[in-house]
A protein has these predicted regions:
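Domain-level signature for soluble enzymes in the chorismate/prephenate branch of the shikimate pathway
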Residues: 1-318
């Protein structure tokens, strides 16, 4: 049970208002949390994560993975640098884009379109078919593109329209010139709630764990060695990406999500295996998966199977 006298957690998100990330936070907050209006927007993912590290807020919502464009590098890299952070939970948000502009804008007058770098590739086909001569102008977020058009920014932006969420068009009083312009109508983005390390949510039976792994050196079979740790314990991976470490050309780490909770025996054994064969393993949290799908262990990888094997080994040693 939550303590009714405990202060509400202070939340932040990758903003400004009207981002898909704010929508993710709205669906995450419960009646016990402070309201969405009290949540602080941060203009970049790195600023949002730094605010948690500095203790300015307790939790922030950031995008991590899109079903069309893949991993959000800014988040993967910022989660992985500086002081440790952990993921407390995840949210899935269906992504619907609109083309929005100040009221009265003539579509024929649009020369530039502003949006986030992860949004643009998701509307590329629509743009090529409908606004082939418009050039793309990158902005910090989809909502930042809309906000600047509304004249709230310091100066006029170098574009006439924005690709953003319907909510951003509404918040910043823009006119929707075209609805539902995503090339893939079933696009979904996954967002994560991040805090400083301290508590790990209890196992729910439908959990995921995120780690970043650094290998000792570049050698034949290095990746296989690492994958074997998962395969041998019947663990399903749900995302695997290599990211440059930035230390030297060809130096990569692996960012991995897999099914199970750090409290599960098979997950513990896998983490120990990784720790043995790799130079470093950064634990980024165990949390309930957004779709709530239960994680099934195979007959040979249940907690009971591990406990039985451990008891047997102990009896031999005794
Ligand atoms: O710019 C926003 O509105 C965001 O919340 C970021 C973000 C992302 O980084 O993927 C979220 C969902 C969309 O796929 C496009 C942009």
């Amino acid at each position: 049970m939550t303590d009714p006298h405990a202060p509400a957690l202070r939340h932040g998100y990758f903003g400004p208002q009207g981002t898909f990330t704010q929508m993710a936070l709205a669906s995450w907050l419960t009646a016990d949390d402070a309201t969405l209006a009290a949540a602080r927007p941060f203009g970049t993912v790195a600023l949002a994560l730094d605010a948690v590290r500095a203790g300015e807020v307790d939790r922030v919502m950031v995008p991590i993975e899109n079903s069309v464009e893949g991993g959000v590098s800014a988040t993967l890299d910022a989660l992985n640098s500086d002081d440790p952070l952990v993921i407390q939970g995840e949210v899935l948000v269906p992504i619907t884009f609109v083309l929005a502009a100040p009221r009265g804008t003539d579509r024929a007058a649009i020369r530039g379109v502003g949006s986030h770098s992860h949004a643009w590739p998701q509307v590329r086909g629509w743009m090529a078919a409908n606004l082939p001569s418009a050039s793309y102008v990158p902005t910090l977020s989809t909502a930042a593109a809309a906000e600047a058009l509304a004249g709230l920014g310091e100066k006029r932006p170098p574009y006439e329209a924005a690709v953003c969420a319907p909510m951003a068009a509404e918040v910043f009083g823009l006119e929707v010139l075209a609805d539902d312009i995503g090339d893939n109508r079933s696009a979904v983005t996954r967002f994560v709630v991040v805090s400083r390390p301290g508590t790990v949510p209890p196992p729910s039976g439908a959990d995921k764990t995120t780690v970043v792994i650094y290998q000792h050196d570049d050698h034949p079979g290095g990746l296989l060695e690492l994958l074997e740790q998962f395969a041998a314990r019947g663990i399903n991976m749900t995302r695997l990406e290599s990211r440059p470490t930035g230390q030297a050309m060809g130096s990569y780490c692996f960012s991995i999500d897999f099914e199970g909770h750090v409290a599960d025996e098979r997950v513990g054994e896998t983490l120990m295996g990784l720790r043995r064969v790799c130079a470093d393993v950064r634990f980024l949290g165990s949390y309930r998966r957004a779709d709530g799908r239960p994680v099934e262990a195979t007959r040979t990888t249940t907690d009971e199977a591990y406990a039985d094997a451990r008891a047997w080994l102990q009896s031999l040693r005794d």
